[in-house]
Amino acid sequence: MTPSFATCDLCDAHKNDVSGAFRVLPPVFRDFGGVRQFCGPVVTVKCFEDNSSVKAAVESVGYQETPAGRVGKVLVVDGGGSLRRALLGGNLGAAAARNGWAGVVIDGCVRDVSELAAVGLGIRALASMPLPTEKRGEGQSDLALQIQGVWVRPGDWLYADEDGMVLAAGRLV
């Protein structure tokens, strides 16, 4: 279950943070998933026009057990901002939901938009693009990324709602 939060309230509470522990992603991402509000610890993938590592991630367990219960993770994908190929489609979106992921954020494109809207998963990306990726088996995971100029690290917490997305070095709610 997603805890109750509002990104505006989180920004109000952390507006004077100059340490870099609290960050705000720019408002360039569109909402494609069936879930509008989501949060969780971040897992990272870096790939360019090859979604092999995205597929491997969403086909793995997308949650962690905590004393408070099961917490879905958020996959953050650095697709280099490419608008030429889709890194996530209906099949992979369904796999992510089935495996317990809370959300997927892609600095790149998605496809199968109507299928993604029906999936119980938060999905943010730059745009839709019907072309699939090449399958070269390339990509890296579990590394610090710069997404639209903002640092995102494995283990950060990402909070997303209708107002935007914020990151924190640890869990806030």
From Swiss-Prot:
Physiological role: Catalyzes the aldol cleavage of 4-hydroxy-4-methyl-2-oxoglutarate (HMG) into 2 molecules of pyruvate. Also contains a secondary oxaloacetate (OAA) decarboxylase activity due to the common pyruvate enolate transition state formed following C-C bond cleavage in the retro-aldol and decarboxylation reactions.
Keyword Lyase included in the entry's annotation: yes
EC nos: 4.1.3.17, 4.1.1.112
GO BP, one annotated term: regulation of RNA metabolic process
Residues where substrate binds: G89, G90, N91, L92, R111
Cofactor binding, note field: Divalent metal cation.
Keyword terms: Lyase, Metal-binding
Residue positions binding a divalent metal cation: D112
NCBIfam families referenced in this protein's UniProt entry, alphabetically: NOT-MenG, PRK09372.1
Alphabetical list of SUPFAM superfamilies matching this protein: RraA-like
This protein's record includes keyword Lyase: yes
Cofactor names: a divalent metal cation
Molecular function terms from GO: 4-hydroxy-4-methyl-2-oxoglutarate aldolase activity; metal ion binding; oxaloacetate decarboxylase activity; ribonuclease inhibitor activity
Record field: catalytic activity: 4-hydroxy-4-methyl-2-oxoglutarate = 2 pyruvate; oxaloacetate + H(+) = pyruvate + CO2
Complex and partners: Homotrimer.
Identification of the protein by name: Putative 4-hydroxy-4-methyl-2-oxoglutarate aldolase
